[in-house]
């Protein structure tokens, strides 16, 4: 286009070379008007302007902006796109659960952990199992034997020797016959052995003479004497009074129920309304090891008895200065359980030194001791007034033994359990008692009849090492080892109440005590993480949970006359009062 314009301009220029030519030759074509060529010339006023804007902070696509909405929900099982490795294994977003324990934090798809689906051929599994039982080796199941050369576990040398043969293969190696000395020449009368020849690897054992036998008998007798364990003698019982005077100015001991504490401790009527405890108001410290159990004084609850793994039993004040009144010393091993009689004047203690001891609460004197050479796990007085001389103890040899304090002898044995007996609770106006055991069963007994008339054992049941009777006597709260509290009826049929199951705490492996509030509105229990859990009785909802002890919170007792006072004990050696 530009070349055509240039040629046109040149043709116009050649025609206007001189004025004479233009004048002489009038017949030439006239010049075009200037307006007609305006579109071919460059306008001097038109200028090309380039505007450049300088921005010191340009917009940049941030990586976080691009990744919004890409976070995966850890609960989702299927993903509709292909996420990156970083996206799939990024840490979880959102607030952290403050009550999440170490067991709960681990990924799992079932209650006890994470189970991966796997398929094992029954024949191949049985083949390897029998091979291992017969020859002592089997293929390593953790390796893919199709891709890796076969590796064995167990006796690898035997596997190489047999070339990996299994019990189902016909070419297995036959055991070598034992070789005998050969001398089959019958003409050799003195040296002929025949079928009576000895084996090559046979060893001759000479019978000791009479003198040697006597020496051997003496040596074995000495060894037996050394090996015999000396029978554990009961430890020397003593008591320490920690207050200056045992009696006040009126001659009353600390067993006297106080009347100036703001609560009627002699009343048999429970408080109308109970409330949740919220703060710690006192700590009793005196035990050097974990506290096993705490028991309140019968009816009034103005005294507290505690037993510990430091082999000591201590009596504390609940009101006033809350002092330690007396220490009872007499067991050589950890004390497992304690129990007051109905009046509170005496109490029993059961310890791992295989002794049950009867103590006087006021003087601290050890009245008598009982043992059948087995470890007692629990002990209970018969609550009836006319049977205060009888008590029962659950033993480690699967028996419940009944003793008479007056004679010191065993008067009855209940031996139907298949495991160590953990708890004994009297029900139905003390005519019957309920026992639980390591055999995961619950049995109900008539008093003094050694045959259980009710046996409860479901396949889904776990061991229940702590059982408590409700204040109204209608329900049994059982601490089950599958982290829940089960409620059984305690009057007629002893049925499981499936509407009342309390969950949310971690007690697997610990016999944490359960208790009720006096008005039956709350259920309390410690747990393995040292927390105190409080549930609502009607709705089974977990109302409150707070840290009570640094170690396992093994015991929790609600004061029978207070609206919100709870006493807890733990394996940190402390006893705490909450209100």
Swiss-Prot record:
Classification via Gene3D superfamilies: YVTN repeat-like/Quinoprotein amine dehydrogenase (2.130.10.10)
Comp. bias intervals (Low complexity): 1-19
Ranges of the WD repeats in the UniProt entry: 286-326, 330-369, 371-413, 416-455, 459-498, 504-545, 548-578
Keywords on record: mRNA processing, mRNA splicing, Nucleus, Repeat, Spliceosome, WD repeat
Disulphide bridges, residue numbers: none
One Pfam family cited in the UniProt record for this chain: WD40
Modification after translation, per record: Undergoes isomerization of the peptide bond between Gly-94 and Pro-95. The reaction is catalyzed by PPIL1.
Family matches, as PANTHER family: PRE-MRNA-PROCESSING FACTOR 17
Name of the featured protein: Pre-mRNA-processing factor 17
Native organism: Mus musculus
Gene for this chain: Cdc40
